[in-house]
Amino acid sequence: MGDHTYKKKDSGIYDALNMLVYDYLLKMKYEGSAKIFFNEAGLENFKPGEGMPILAQWYAAFHDISAVRSGLSSNLQDLNRIEGIMMKLENEKRRYQHIGRIDPGAMGYGGTVDPYKQYPMYYQQFDQRKMYEMYGQMSPTADATPRFYDPRKGSMPGPGYRAAQGYPRYHPRFEEQGVPPAKMAPKQFRDEGRSGNVESPSIATNQEGSSPLFESVLGGGDRQFGLKEVMLFVPSEHTAVCSAVAGEHKILLVASSNKTITAVNLLSGKNESTVETDEKQVVEMKIREYEDEIIVVCGIADNELLLVRCTMKGSANLEIAGILRGHTASIVSFEVLDSIHSLDSGGIMRKWTLNGVFEREEVLSGEILHICCISEDNFMFADRQRVYVYDFELNIEMMEILKGQALGIKRIKDGFIVVFRNQAIWLDKRIQKVKVLNVNESIRTATLIDGDLVAASSQNVWFDNGKSLAKIKLHETGIVALDGVNVFRKPSVISCSASGECKIWIKYVGD
């Protein structure tokens, strides 16, 4: 069989797809057929490019399609999802053909080239992981409204159903931005900068010239702002170890050195509930809010996680819900979204339901120090050299986004904040840089207030006030937590110090 049977010499995409077929034959243990195909397709000179990560995505989709068409799978969700993939492929094809027909230069390649040739999917050097978006799903619990619509189920009552059961209502570009999807296209993770990466201060110092104290992709204005204290309260006379804010319920949770957690009403500054933590010292808390309760997952510097529920019926009521056991090494990082994910020092990452039921685990490579959920199965991982995107479901790395050792990654309402020793970087929900704040003190944590970065170091906070880098002393003892919150209908931040003192600060604008 000739070379032309499998590919066209002038199109790199055929090499990538042929490589996929070859990989599939090997995985199915058809070594003889794989060898013949490899030779006849002329893959001996094939050199993988940046598009290679798509092969894993293609293989997963191809495997599912094959299972459905061969009758090995009769699962209704699989059938519907495959139909959804096919429909999205066809719709994208027609949409780009239509755009190219109306304005051949609109695709970014100019001229009067055939619109199909203009579609980036046909260029191997383009990020072929665009196809990953076509294979994605949306989190069914992330929003009460249906993210996908299946015309066959138009008469079905009730709120949203799983994304696997239908098709997108809009093109992903026009989907609501307030809800993180269960799958995000890796194309959306790319920084638009020339190098594709944001460098940490340790790397920036080795370059000529000094970076500005404050960078903004959105641009700055002439306004000058500051912070004004509006409330002070002390939830406990003991040392505050960590805290977490439930913004929707206006509740502050403070873990103290006497091994208790206290729930404080941010509108009144009064304690509403306190619970003992079974003689376990809580050192970190992450939460998930619902209409009538707050799920609190607590790190205790051990190989276990403590699960606490805060029911919201009239007032907050804290109670211990259980302990998550199973790790054989100490847990170094954990995250909460629609599930709980925990990573131990041995590289084992486990997934749990919000009720504490174990679901699965993966063995990860490298010394990962921090994890942060981008969506239910997409994560940002940070090790000693970089920050990168990882797909937990497929167990593959997607791409690197930042260089340097991050001290922490915080998921916020408007995206993510990555903290380095002297730098805080705000990334939006598509993992693209929005603002960078550089300070000359060691940063402990950072947050946003009305679109402005505020970084905490020791007793002080740093921010760009519109004209210069400003520094304000918030507490007499070290700041242990700094979070954005909207109290009294004003952009605010809440700070907690080691002494147990908590303060709410509002943003004011002046000359």
UniProtKB/Swiss-Prot annotation:
Extent of Polar residues compositional bias: 197-210
Segments forming domain LisH: 13-45
Disordered as annotated region, ranges: 172-212
Cysteine disulfide partners in this protein: none
Signal peptide (from-to): none
PROSITE patterns for the chain: LISH
Domain of life assignment: Eukaryota
Protein's name in the database: Uncharacterized LisH domain-containing protein ECU04_1490
Species annotation: Encephalitozoon cuniculi (strain GB-M1)
Source lineage: Eukaryota, Fungi, Fungi incertae sedis, Microsporidia, Unikaryonidae
